[in-house]
């Protein structure tokens, strides 16, 4: 009995690992992490986070989200088929080829699929398309609409509570040619969810769980989904606008759930839901981009103090609990407002430093710590660099 249980769990996860979406996730994160580290080195001559962080940071939130979604899908008894899963895999690969991370979500994948359902009167008679519609027709539109809405709400929660976690700091030139800082939040969460498929579609073992619903016998399987997200922030600390985006996505998901419920009675509403999901999700991203462009740049050089653009993990700055968006006003009693001045003030005492920091509430706090050989020359604090003005040597 115990061995059968272990075999069941092993097979359960083997089917999960056999899904191409899992390997698509690994491949995409490989290239995303490589590009991120390259851009961080261009900005700061050092990486901020290890490449492995792109895998580890989203892993647990995605897993926990999958657990909560699975409770709902099991409770609703959502039934899909392997043919339907195959179409989802193909759509994920298609959207991955666009290189747009934010499109790698069920909002776009299932939204596109629902629109494809709606085109059946036009495309259903075509020789190569008819078999696809024949297989997709086995899955009611209301199920696809329900899955889309559930994942959109889950996407909103992931963005709100985990979207800004370890966002990547960068430097770029402003329109006036000055160096400014920004943060790039780019995540792909892997969300494994339990669905039901008709028994016999996959091989099982003696004690594999099966459920009978009328004349149909069902078996559960783990199916991985991807939820991608990207947002650039220049006008504030990254947490605020990203949390706002998450709240808007949750609200959109709740609003569209009315269409999902209505599609139980009027199936065509599911097709309308697919189109609205794509359009309004794009509008949310566009609105955030426009709003961000109108904001004054938050991470820039200023007359008083050095604003913290980033903090290297496990650095003296991290141990002193310095946070992104705080302003270092004094270093070892010396007022600073440039990266060069900050470094020079640190040299006053090479073994110890004391900082006066203006926190997010506008209050001064003190931070101090010992310095050791081999540590980052700027405590592990990433600042916006200023342009060096060279003196004319000709007199």
Give residue spans per PLM region.
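Membrane-helix interface "capping/anchor" motifs
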Residues: 96-109, 232-244
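Conserved PDZ fold ligand-binding element
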Residues: 317-339
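Membrane-cytosol interface motif
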Residues: 296-320, 326
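PDZ-domain C-terminal substructure recognizer with occasional recognition of PDZ-binding tails
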Residues: 343-387
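Generic multipass alpha-helical transmembrane bundles of integral membrane proteins
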Residues: 116-238
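Interdomain regulatory linker/hinge segments that flank or connect interaction modules
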Residues: 208, 228-290
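N-terminal signal-anchor module of multipass membrane proteins
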Residues: 1-73
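Structural signature of hydrophobic alpha-helical transmembrane segments
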Residues: 17-32, 73-89, 140-149, 212-222
């Amino acid at each position: 009995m115990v061995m059968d249980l272990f075999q069941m769990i092993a097979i359960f996860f083997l089917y999960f690992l056999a899904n191409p979406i899992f390997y698509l996730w690994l491949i995409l994160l490989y290239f995303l992490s490589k590009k991120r580290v390259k851009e961080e080195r261009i900005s700061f001559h050092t990486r901020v986070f290890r490449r492995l962080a792109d895998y580890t940071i989203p892993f647990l939130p995605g897993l926990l989200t999958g657990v909560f979604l699975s409770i709902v899908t099991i409770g609703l008894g959502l039934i899909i088929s392997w043919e339907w899963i195959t179409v989802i895999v193909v759509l994920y690969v298609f959207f991955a080829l666009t290189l747009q991370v934010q499109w790698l979500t069920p909002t776009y994948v299932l939204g596109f699929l629902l629109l494809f359902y709606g085109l059946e009167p036009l495309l259903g008679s075509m020789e190569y398309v008819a078999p696809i519609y024949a297989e997709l027709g086995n899955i009611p539109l209301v199920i696809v609409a329900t899955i889309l809405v559930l994942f959109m709400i889950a996407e909103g929660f992931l963005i709100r509570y985990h979207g800004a976690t370890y966002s990547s700091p960068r430097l770029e030139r402003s329109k006036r040619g000055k160096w400014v800082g920004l943060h790039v939040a780019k995540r792909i969460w892997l969300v494994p969810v339990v669905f039901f498929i008709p028994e016999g579609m996959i091989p099982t073992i003696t004690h594999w769980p099966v459920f009978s619903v009328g004349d149909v016998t069902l078996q559960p399987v783990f199916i991985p989904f991807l939820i991608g997200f990207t947002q650039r922030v220049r006008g504030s600390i990254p947490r605020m606008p990203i949390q706002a985006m998450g709240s808007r996505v949750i609200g959109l998901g709740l609003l569209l759930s009315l269409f999902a419920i209505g599609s139980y009675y009027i199936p065509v509403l599911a097709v309308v839901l697919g189109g609205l999901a794509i359009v309004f999700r794009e509008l949310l991203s566009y609105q955030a981009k426009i709003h961000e462009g109108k904001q004054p740049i938050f991470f820039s050089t200023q007359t008083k103090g050095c604003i913290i653009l980033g903090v290297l993990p496990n650095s003296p700055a991290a141990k002193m609990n310095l946070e992104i968006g705080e302003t270092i006003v004094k270093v070892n009693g010396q007022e600073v407002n440039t990266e060069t001045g900050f470094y020079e003030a640190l040299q006053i005492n090479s073994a110890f430093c004391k900082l006066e920091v203006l926190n997010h509430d506008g209050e001064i706090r003190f931070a101090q710590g010992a310095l050791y050989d081999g540590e980052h020359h700027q405590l592990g604090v990433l600042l916006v660099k200023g342009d060096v003005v060279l003196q004319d040597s000709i007199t």
